[in-house]
């Protein structure tokens, strides 16, 4: 029956309470403990509540979680490949018991849902990483979240929706499964091919999706992710404008666009099956699965996390049970002598095939060079040029890290003056001591508070970078994970340069005007970096500077030369 087939598990599980019950729940919510949802948790909750994650009725219990990790199945036996869990902090978990109700709120404190806590446990995260993602390497974004960001305790239980999360952007393009199924019925679409993407579409993608729908004798749903995808993806505002331009290239009444508020895990084969289940719940009959579908790229040794066909092979193993047809993505190439895109297996030996790699396309965007019209559409290129100005017009952050007394602040001040002298952009210095005084005065020097201080610095720097200014940060920043989070936050918004001021500790001690090292060695000060608290040496710093034989002026000049080589200044 095409688009009218049953949702996964047999029933669309929309979890919002009726209005009168939601009002009652709101009144009693103040009596419950409240958990402020992270962006990823809010995405998961949104798709739980609207039925996209059917047949789930809440965040997974331990029994469901363990069976999903080990067997890709719920306790009921229904196929489900991805753990959907609510991770919380240890302190919050200590105040919650099985049988309690908790309030789930967004970042502004708006009550989105309540949850009946039926289970709480401490998961074996390494085991989860190995079973679900096939690796414990935290260069995998899902493993990184799991090992370095997720709370230590999971809560499981049914959720009851109070009101949907508020989105102010592209409202007409956001659909629940029941709404999209209704649209398909209204249009008379009985077979629908779904295409997921988190990247802009160019001519090759338009051609392959149109061919896929035509060969399946179906209509086409383009359903891009606008929740959380890769950190290096374009912002979704830019992408959606690009999708709207590309939509004009399809024949009328054949294709529709709808946005999906999904937090991707980049989980490769399992993620492909998960994506298919979601599209089945939205009413689709076919799903396009690409090579290395939802793969995160290479591990820290330069090897791919997943093989190119792993996702298609796992999908095929479960295709009958999934009850949604896989459409393997065909590699499209541009044949210059025929002036058209063709599947690579339909080309002839005499054909002249030309291509433009993603890195080369990015370079041309960054440097304002010509993008051939055979590669993309002029309106798409125009949107991407606006989002990716030449590097010398972008904002950037220079992030110093090093021991107390290493020379960070002195070099940072010298660099600031030189950049102000250049005058191409506004410059802001976020020095460690100044930030402690004005932004983080209530924080201690515990590891938790040190990380929070670096998060604050990173947030301010990201806003400066996003608005095309220059941020110079000069904290000690002793912990690698906090530094990595700042890098990941800023990199999608502009340039990021980490400068490790590697001056030896004995030189730093000899410069100590405040006597802090002496107090630390005497045991008067605890948790002092380099003495009784570790400094984790950066592995990815763009520049390493030892100031014992280098003046601040020369050090700043060296940084300027590197910025010039990278194209951020002229």
Identify the function of each model-found stretch:
Residues 183, 187, 317-474, 478-509, ...:
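Glycine-rich phosphate-binding loop of ATP-dependent small-molecule kinases
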Residues 1-392:
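Active-site cores that bind ATP or allylic diphosphates and position pyrophosphate for catalysis
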């Amino acid at each position: 029956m095409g688009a009218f087939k049953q949702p996964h598990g047999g029933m669309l599980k929309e979890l919002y309470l009726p209005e009168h019950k939601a009002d009652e729940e709101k009144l009693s919510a103040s009596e419950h403990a409240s958990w402020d949802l992270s962006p990823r948790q809010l995405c998961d909750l949104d798709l739980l509540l609207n039925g996209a994650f059917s047949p789930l009725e809440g965040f997974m219990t331990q029994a469901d979680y363990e069976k999903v990790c080990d067997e890709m199945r719920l306790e009921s036996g229904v196929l489900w490949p991805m753990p959907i869990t609510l991770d919380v902090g240890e302190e919050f978990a200590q105040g919650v018991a099985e049988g309690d109700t908790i309030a789930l709120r967004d970042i502004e404190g708006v009550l989105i849902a309540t949850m009946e806590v039926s289970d709480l446990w401490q998961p074996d995260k390494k085991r989860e990483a190995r079973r679900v993602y096939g690796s414990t390497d935290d260069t995998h974004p899902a493993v990184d979240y799991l090992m370095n960001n997720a709370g230590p305790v999971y809560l499981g239980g049914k959720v009851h929706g109070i009101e949907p999360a508020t989105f102010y952007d592209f409202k007409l393009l956001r659909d629940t499964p029941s709404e999209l199924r209704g649209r398909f019925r209204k249009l008379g679409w009985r077979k629908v091919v779904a295409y997921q993407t988190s990247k802009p579409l160019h001519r090759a993608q338009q051609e392959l999706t149109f061919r896929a729908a035509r060969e399946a004798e179906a209509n086409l749903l383009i359903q891009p992710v606008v929740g959380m995808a890769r950190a290096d993806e374009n912002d979704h505002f830019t992408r959606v404008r690009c999708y709207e331009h590309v939509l004009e290239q399809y024949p009328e009444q054949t294709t529709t666009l709808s946005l999906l508020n999904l937090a991707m895990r980049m989980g490769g084969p399992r993620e492909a099956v998960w994506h298919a289940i979601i599209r089945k719940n939205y009413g689709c009959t076919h799903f396009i699965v690409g090579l290395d579908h939802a793969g995160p790229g290479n591990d820290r040794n330069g090897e791919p996390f997943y093989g190119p066909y792993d996702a298609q092979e796992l999908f095929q193993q479960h295709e009958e049970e999934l009850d949604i047809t896989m459409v393997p993505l065909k590699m499209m190439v541009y044949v210059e002598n025929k002036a058209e895109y063709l599947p690579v297996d339909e080309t002839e030996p005499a054909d002249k095939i030309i291509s433009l790699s993603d890195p080369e396309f990015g370079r041309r965007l960054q440097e304002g060079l010509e993008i051939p019209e055979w590669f993309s559409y002029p309106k798409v290129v125009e949107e991407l040029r606006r989002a990716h100005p030449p590097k010398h017009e972008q904002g950037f952050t220079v992030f110093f890290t090093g021991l107390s007394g290493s020379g960070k602040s002195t070099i940072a001040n010298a660099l600031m003056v030189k950049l102000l002298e250049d005058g191409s952009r506004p410059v802001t210095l976020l020095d460690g001591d100044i930030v402690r005084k004005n932004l983080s005065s209530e924080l201690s020097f515990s590891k938790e508070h040190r990380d929070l201080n670096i998060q604050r610095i990173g947030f301010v720097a990201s806003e400066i970078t996003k608005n095309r200014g220059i941020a110079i940060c000069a904290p000690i920043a002793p912990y690698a994970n906090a530094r990595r989070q700042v890098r990941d936050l800023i990199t999608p918004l502009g340039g990021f340069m980490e400068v490790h001021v590697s001056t030896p500790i004995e030189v730093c001690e000899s410069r100590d005007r405040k006597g802090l090292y002496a107090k630390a060695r005497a045991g008067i000060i605890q948790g002092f970096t380099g003495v009784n608290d570790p400094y984790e040496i950066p592995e990815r710093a763009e520049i390493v500077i030892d100031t014992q034989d280098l003046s601040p002026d020369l050090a700043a000049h060296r940084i300027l030369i590197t910025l010039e080589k990278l194209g951020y200044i002229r």
